Every structure is written in C-alpha cells, then in structure tokens.
Amino acid sequence: MDSDNWNFQNNPYFQDYNIGNPNNNTNGINGSSNGTMNLSNSASLFLNKNLGNSDFQPFSLQPSLYLSNSSNNTNNNNNNNNNNNNNNNNNNNNNNNNNNNNNNNIINNNTDEFVFKKISANNLQTPTSPPKDLGFIQTILQHQQELFQKKLSESGVTNLQPDQIQFMFMQEQQKYLTSLNGNDNTLPPLENNFSFQHVNNNNLTSPPQQQQQQQQQQQQQQHQQHQQHQQHQQQQQQQQQQQQQQHQHQQQQQQQQQQQQQQQQQQQQQQLKQQQPQQHPIQSPQPIQSPTPSPSLQQHQTYSYTPSTQQTSLQQLQQQQMQQLLQMSPQHQQQHNQIQQQQAAAAAAALLQQQLAQQQAQQLAQQQQLAQQQLAQQQQQQQQQHVQSLHQAQVQQAHMSQLQQQQLAQQAFQQAQQQQFHQQNIQQHQNQNQQQLQLPQPQQQQHKSTPPTQNTPPVKSPAPQTPTLTTNGKGSKSTPPTTTTTTTTTTSSSSSSSSSSSSSKKKTSNKKTGNLQVPPTPPHHHHHHHNNHHHHHSEGFSDENDEEFIDENEDKSKNKSRSSQNIASRNYRQRKKDHISEVEFKVQQLSLENERLKQENHLLKKGDLGDVMRPDFDFQQVLLESQKLMSQLQDAVNKQDHATIENLLQLYYFASQLRTTVVEREVEKIVHPYTQARLAVMGYRSNAETSILLRPFSTNLWWPKYADEVGLTEEQRKASDILWTDHLKIDMELRTERDQLDREIKELFLKKIVSHGTKRPELLFERETLSTFNSESDYPSSPSSASNSSNSPPTSSPTIITPPDSPLTNNQNNQNNNQMINSNSNNSNNNSHHHHHHHHSHLHGHSPYPVPNGTVHPPPTTAVSEHNKPIELSELLDVTRKLEMLKKNFVKHRNLICDTDLVLSTILTPFQHAKLILRLNSVTCYDFSIVDTITGIWGSINSTLKEGSFIQNLMPDQDGKFEVLEKFKQNQLLDLKGQRPIKLESLQRTYEKLYQTVLGSESPNCQFVKQADYQHQNLLTASPNYTNSPLITSSPSQLTPNSPRPPLDISNNNNNNNNNNNNNNNNNNNNNNNNNNNNNNNNNNNNNNNNNNNNNNSNNNNNTNNNNNNYNNNGNNNNGNNNNGNNNNGNNGNNGNNSNNSNNGNINSVDIQALHQQQKQNLQPQQLQQNQQLQQNQNTPPQQSQQVCSPSSPMTPELNKQPEIVGGDNTNKKNKSKKYQWYSYKTPNI
C-alpha cells in the first residue's frame, strides 16, 4: 500500500466517491504517499478561467447518482404508508410520488453538502457548498461582475484583458470573504488558478485609489524607518554613558580597597608587637605565620616579602593614601578608626584560635601515647593469663587421667567376678578394651625406639584439647572438653625448626582426634610420662610460648577470612535483592501487557470491528500536523522564501519517519489472527491499489507539465525516470508477495481454523467440496458473491454454505430454496465423475440440505475422518510465520515510499521538491467524523444483538467449541431419534397433496360478477396503454384442467416475461387475463383494476364480501411496495399517465362504494354480525403472505375448473371445510 492511509482501501469506512468523473468507477478515494486523497481530474480544476454559465459545470458531484437507490427506497416506504390507507385513490399516490421526488432532491443535496465540506480549499474554483440553484448563482455573479466593470470604467481603468478583470474581481470577493470569515488564512492565493499573458503590461492603468494607498504606505514606512533609526541612536548613547559610569565606579572601588588593605596591615603589626611579649615572655621572637591565614593576610604577607622594587611602589601608595586621609573630614576619620579597631580585634581572635588549636593537638598526641601503652600492658597481661591457664589445664588433665585409670581398674575387677551372670556385658567390655588398646600401641613403640638423651632436651607435646582458648583479646574460642587424653614424650635430635614443624603436625592430629574417646594408657607408660613431665618442665614452657604465638597468627588469618566472607555474603545478598526486584518489575510489566491483550482479544471476539479498526489518537494527530505543515509550505512557496522552505522540508522528512511508527501500529491490528479470521469468514479479499497520481497513465499527463513549470534539466529528468522504474519494480514485487500471502492465509483460516479445529463428525458441509475449487477462488472475491454464488458452477466461485440458524440462511431461504435444490441436482449430474467417490464415502452425515436422486444413506458412524483432526502445532506455526511475513511486507512498502522520497530530494532542488509535495497533497479527504459515525452504527448494532454478532457465533469460545455447530449437533440428534431425515421425496409429496386439495375444492357462487367484469373491461379499454400491451394474446389462464405443465412452471414463465412487476403477475395469474395487458406500462392502473375486479367478484359472495375486499386491499399494499420499488423512474417521467390514473382511481372508488351499499342491503343481520367480527380481525398489519380469493366469471370459465397455484401454506389445511379456498404466496425479497 502506497500511503499512510492504506487502511482506506480495505476498510468499509471509506466509500467509493467519484468526484468529477462519473464514467470511471475505479477512481475513488485512494491514498497518496503522504496520507491524502487525490483526484484523477485534479488537473481539470484549473481549466475554467471564465466566470459564467460554465463556471460550475465540472464540479457536479456524482454521489447523488449513487445514492439514488437509497432515495427510491424511501419512496417505496412512503408509498407503503399511503397504500395502506387508500389503495383506490391514485391521486394521492401521484402526489406522494411528487413529494417523494422532492425529498430525493433534499437528500441528495444534503449528501452533496456533506462531501463538499470535506474537500480542501486549495482550489478556489471548487465551491464549499453544492450548487443548489445554478441559475440563481450565475445571475448574481454576472450582476456583480457588471457592477465591478462599471466601477473600473468610472475610475478610468481601461484596456484590461478579461482574465485580468476576473482576477481583480476575485480579489475583491476574496477580501470580502476574509472579512466575513475573520481573516481566515486558509484561503489559497489566486495566482495558482489564473495565468496571464503579460503582453499589454504597458497599457495597464491602476486606479487612483490604489496609487494613493501605495503612497501612504510608502510614507508610513519611511516615517517608521526614521523613528527606528533615532531610537537606535539613543540606545547607543545610553549604553556608552552606562559603560563610563561603571568604569568610574570600578576605579573608586579599587582605590578604597587598597586604602583598607594598607590600614589593616598597620593595625595588625601594632597589635602583634603588643601581644608577643605578654603571651610569650620566654620564647624568642619569631615571624608570625598562621597555618590557615585569611586571604587578606596572605596578600599582605606577599607584599612584605617582595623585593625592593615592590617596596618602593608600596611606599608611594602609602604616601598617596596618607594625603587622602588628611583631606578626609573628621567624621570619615572616626569611621576609619573604628574599622581599624574592628580589624585588629578580629586578627587577635584569629591568633588566639590558632594557639588553642595547637594546644589541643598536643593533648591529643599525649592521649594517643597513653592509650598505646595501656593496650601493650593489656596484651602482656592477657598473654600471661593464657600461659597460666594452659599450665593449670595440663595439671588438671594429669590428675583427671589418674582418677579415671583407678576407676577403670576397679570396674575391671568387678566385671571379672560377675562374668558368670553377665556374659553379654563382659563381651562388650572386652571389645571396648581391645579397641582402646589398639590405639596406644604405636605410641608405645615410638617411646621404646627413641629413648631420651641428655644432650637434646625432650619436647613435651602440648595438650591436644583445652577447655578455653582466647584470641587477640576480642573473643574466646571454646572447644568441647574430652573425657580422656593421651600425652606422649618425643625427643627432637634436630634443630628448632624441626620442633616447630612437629608441633604444628600435632595440632592437626589433635584437631582430628578431638572428639574421639582415647582409652587410658597402661600404668608403666603413665609413670614414665609423669617423671618426664617434672624433669622437662622448664623446657616445655618456652615451647608453649611459641605455640601461642602461632595460634595468634592463625586466629588473625581466620578473622581476615571471616571478614572477607561476610563482605562477599553481603554483596551476594544485595545482588540477589536487586535481581529479585528486576524480575518483579518485569513480571508486573508482563501482567499489564497480558491484561491489555486480554481486553483486545475480548473486543475482537465480540466482533466490534469499529473499536478495533478505528485509528489511534496518535494517527489522527500526525495527520493534522501534516496538514498544518502543508499550509505553511504553501505560504513559503508563494513568498519564495528558500530558507523557510528548506527548514520545512526537514520537518517534513522527520514527520514522514514518525508516520512510519504510527503505521506499524495500524498494521498490527490488521495482521491480528482474529481480524484475519473475521475477514476470511466475511469473504473479504485485499485489493492493493496505487494512488491515482502515481499510476503510469496519470503521470504521463501531469508530469511533463510539472517538469516544464519547474524547469527540470535533462539530467534531472533522466535520474527521475530511472528512480521511477526502480520504484515500480520493487512495488510490483511487494504487491505480488502480499497477494500470495493473503491468499494462503485466508485458505488456512477457511480450511483449518474456522471449519476445523475440534473433532466433530457433524459438519455443515463436506471438506471435499473445497478441494474442487481453484486455488485462486477458494474464497469469494467480494461479500456480494456469497449471495449470487448459488446459481454459478462450483469451479467459478465457491458457495458459502451457511448453517440454518445463521442470518444469511434466514434471509436467503425464501429466495433460493428451489434454486439451490435444482442447482445441486444439476451439478451432481454434471460433475458425477468428480464427486462419485465423494458421495459414497463422505455424505453419510445428515446434511441440512436434501440429498439428490432420492438416495437414502445410513446414519453417521462414530469414526472421525482425516480432515476432522485437531490442528497441529506445525500448522499454527505456519500461520504465525505468514502473518509475520505479511506485517514485514507492509513495513517494507512504507519504507520504500520514504526512501524514494529521500532519493528524490537529492535529485530535485528544495523549491522543486516543495512544489511536487504540494501537488501530490493538493486534495485531502480523510474525515474522522465519517469513521466515528460508522463506528457508532457498528456499536449500536452489536449492542442490540444479545447473543452476539454472526462473526462471534462462528468463532470458537474459550473451550474451543463453536456455537453454531453445537446447535446444529443438537438438531441432528433430535432428527436421529425420530429417524426422519430430510428428503426430496417428502417435499414433493407435500406439494402433490396440496395440488390435489386445490383441484378437489369447489369454486364459490358468483351472482354479480358479470356486471363488474363488463365495467372493468370498459375501464381497461379506456386506458391509453391498453392497445400497446404485448400480453393480450398470451394469457396464462387459458390452460385446460388436463394441462401437462404444473403451476410452478407457469409462474416462472410469467416472471421471465415481466421482470419489473413480479408481484403483479402473480396477482393477475390468480385473477383475470385482461389485467396482465397493462402491467408493463401503468402499474398504478393495474393495481386499481385489480381492486375493481376483486370488489366486483366479491359482490356475489353472500357470507364474507367485506373480508374479501380487505384481503385484496392488503395484497395490493404489498404489490404497491414492489411496483414503486421497480418503476420509480417511470412515474417520475410520465406525469400525464399519473394524472390519467388518478381519474380512473376516482371512478373506481365510486363504483366500489356503490357495490358495498348493494351488498349490505342483500345481507341478513346474522351475516352482518359475522362480517363485523371478521373486519375487526382484518385491522392487523399486512403479512408477507398475500391471500387472494379464486374468483369465477363468465369471461374466464376456465378458472372455475382449474385455479392456478402460486404457492402453498398451512392456511390451506385450516380452510378446507369452507366452500371457497384461500391461497397464499410469499413475496420475494427485492
């Protein structure tokens, strides 16, 4: 699609209005490259330059022609109301027809106004309202133009061309319009619509009023320029004065600052000299340097340490300051002294603060030293306490081991005595002793192999476990106490390094065996250890200090590892929290999006296409902004302001890119699966059309004119031609791809998703019927093809077979019932070689339509065919893939338009490109009010339907079930229980029975028909069109009782002969032959004649004559509907015939009243009462079935023997007992 309003082409919102070109039906509203509507005859808007009779000729709008059908329908409705009141008064009907014609004009004018208001005002010749009375407007314009010419001649303006006079006249009218509209800037300039031949420019004379105005304007401009020049000079002078004053003020401030600085220096020096001997009598004098001096002091210090050249300059400044001080008044001197005193006090306070800060720093240093000493003492105390605690623990462990050994020896002695009584306990005890004795064996062997020597002091192993261990004074490391421990003595013949390594190994072994209960050592081993403990106590004490130092280092490393672990765990927890918060935020966004999608799907399932397909607010805003941009660009082109044109073109390119994002949103709506399924069910097929201006035949017309107007060079023309061919090539490829995708998507929806989707053996129609169609005609080309496809063969266009409960079937059941039966039977015979296997294998299900050839099939089986399987995942993925490709195709087409526009901007100059854009966007016709009205109508229709729309019934619900199919399934189950399938034979039998009952019925007795028939014959011969009737000789009522043709064939022949008035033909078949003679010419006469015949025939009925009249009148009302609907044009054209008909109607009305009076006199009182009751029942509105009494007359004796049947109904069975028979037929829906 070539434009932003691509949805104009495929939406029901945008009607096909042909403006200015009634012959071309395809030139409707089409989208251009910038979201506008272009007219095929836009070039013709600038052709007429002369104001006169031909001014408004090319601007007659064609929607009035297309809307004539709707106005004729209104005429029919009016005729219905009038005919219900009086069918016999033709004068009223003719007047009503005239009124209805007037109403048609009003309706058409209103529609023309509606369309005219939406045309842009870019072309001044296009009127803003439709020309209701062209003659009146032309006279007014001619009169005003004559007055204008007189004024010009009086003012002395002569020798002007007619085009120039018209241009000046239009200028004056435009000024008048601007005054009325409130200075509206939307009116275009007149230079675009008028082209002058500047031949007699020297002969032109302007009016004196214009010259005076020009002179006044020039004087005013000169005066304004002079005033502006004076103001500019004054401003410059004021600025110079202000600058001088500021310079002087700055100089004064600088001098004052220098004076104050010098005074502060002197005061500070004096104060410092006075304060030094008092505060520091012992210290030697030093130069004062504060750690954080103020900026003023820093400046003074720099001056004090400068070289001699600076000192001389300072002396000169001091002298000047002293002279100024002498010149100052005593008041100034006092103020100066006060300022000096304040400054001196501030300097003293700053010095005091510095001294206090130094003292505080010294105190802090002393406190820190004391704290360090205290910490060292505490650490020493802690170490001593730790050593003492270890020694005490070792002693306690030795005593505890001795006590435990004694207790175990006693227990062993007691157990030896009780072996006889406690064998189980003894075995357990022995096992424990064996396990306990196995552990100390390697230790004993080690003691035996390495006896102690005098040169190497023995190293005592530390206690493997201690009850408490302190670390760094910060915390305590507690270990679980053990019941028994082992202590071994080892001799180290190596250096101190080996001892340290053995001690570390012992620590590791003790950690591993800390929780084990080690059995006690034998007595000799314990005695040896006890002796060695006292012998080497002094050497073990030094080893314990080393071990404590190692423990402290290990504790420090453990603390560091713990702190790093804590930091890592803290960082992990923080990252986890952040991750959880991000996940929660994403879940929240997904939930909101899910709710939005649920709402959209709910709307789509309801079938509210109005709300779904309505453009977004952003889309409307973009189009409005583009219209404003076009108006600004038009003004810039008229003024030839190249700078503004370039800026506006940049805005235009940006707006086009912004428009692509909005278009993608609209594309997503169309590509939605529910929307595509709905379009497929409705039989919609996309038709991609290009813009009118961008078609090849139209470009050959306006492009050369544009090239000459703008002055394109040969290089520009060649480059533009190459770009145009490339654009067309890519455009054609994208269109073919889009058509193919659309066809495949519709095919998948119709064959897989809409028809299938769940396992259901009861289907509305067989799947094989779809396979016989061509690939290009699997779905109808337009929605109207669904109603006309029943008469066509299956290979041309498929028939959309709808279920019996759907609205389409209810509307078309009365019209196409017989045709569908006949067409199905004919097609089955013709295409038997294609569907032979199909009828035998797949038509076992009970179809709602009768089966041809009278074959009876068995009930359906429970087996499911291959086509009834659920949709596979691969098929769904295929559908989604094709929908995504369709979306990409739309986006590519949009990008192609934008890229072509950008390349064209490089070929053309900005001025040329601006003119091209304005030409392409000259006419815009996108009205949001039309969209709103259509969506409102759609919403009201959907709100009135309680059960939902037809599309909603076809779509599956949440459980995957179809409502229509479920209803049909229930109906089929009921039919299966009764075992009464629908057959063609049963329908034929019913018609045969009705035909026999009609033949066997008796005709009513007619007594006064003869007089009425002669009178009716006179009326027929008096009509002007009686002799011209082509049906005088061919009367269908001349058939004999033994006629081989059935009545249905007769009605069909009459329908073929008289296409305009089907209902009147049916009435004439039931009545007289003479009435058929005037059906084609004068419809109102036929209706009146039918009324007269019925009334005359009803005079002979003694029982229900009034009832016959009323029924006939009701039937004539229905006939009036169809006659007026078919022959409005004839009534509008023949006013003389209508007047003749009205006269005949008056005569007939008098005759009918006389007949009613005669009938009432002949009737008895009882019969009158019965007639009154029947008349009350006749006040009900006319039904669709028209009841006609079968009359008998001497002119048509055949009717007494064989009345013709137009249709049968159940009312015939109720009236069998009566002497006369009523017959009804249903009027077809036109």
Swiss-Prot record:
GO process terms (BP): cell differentiation; chemotaxis; negative regulation of asexual sporulation resulting in formation of a cellular spore; positive regulation of sorocarp stalk cell differentiation; programmed cell death; regulation of cell differentiation; regulation of gene expression; response to differentiation-inducing factor 1
Composition bias type Low complexity, residue spans: 69-108, 192-233, 270-287, 295-310, 422-447, 476-503, 774-803, 810-831, 1052-1146, 1153-1193
Compartmental location: Nucleus
Main location: nucleus
Region (Basic motif): 556-586
Disulphide bridges: none
Residue ranges with Polar residues bias: 448-458, 466-475, 562-571, 1025-1042
Compositionally biased residues, Acidic residues: 541-554
Coiled coil: 728-753
SMART domains: BRLZ
Statement: the UniProt record of this protein carries the keyword DNA-binding: yes
bZIP domain mapped to chain residues: 555-618
A GO cellular component annotation in the UniProt record: cytoplasm
Listed Basic residues bias regions: 523-537, 832-845
Record key words, sorted: Coiled coil, Differentiation, DNA-binding, Nucleus, Sporulation, Transcription, Transcription regulation
GO molecular function: DNA-binding transcription factor activity; identical protein binding; sequence-specific DNA binding
Domain of life from the UniProt record: Eukaryota
Ranges where the record places region Disordered: 65-108, 180-233, 270-310, 422-578, 772-869, 1025-1230
Self-association and partners: Binds DNA as a dimer. Heterodimerizes with dimB; in vitro. Also able to form homodimer; in vitro.
Family as reported in the entry's similarity comment: Belongs to the bZIP family.
UniProt cross-references to PANTHER family, sorted A to Z: BASIC-LEUCINE ZIPPER TRANSCRIPTION FACTOR A (PTHR14312:SF1), CREB/ATF BZIP TRANSCRIPTION FACTOR (PTHR14312)
Protein name: Basic-leucine zipper transcription factor A
Gene: dimA
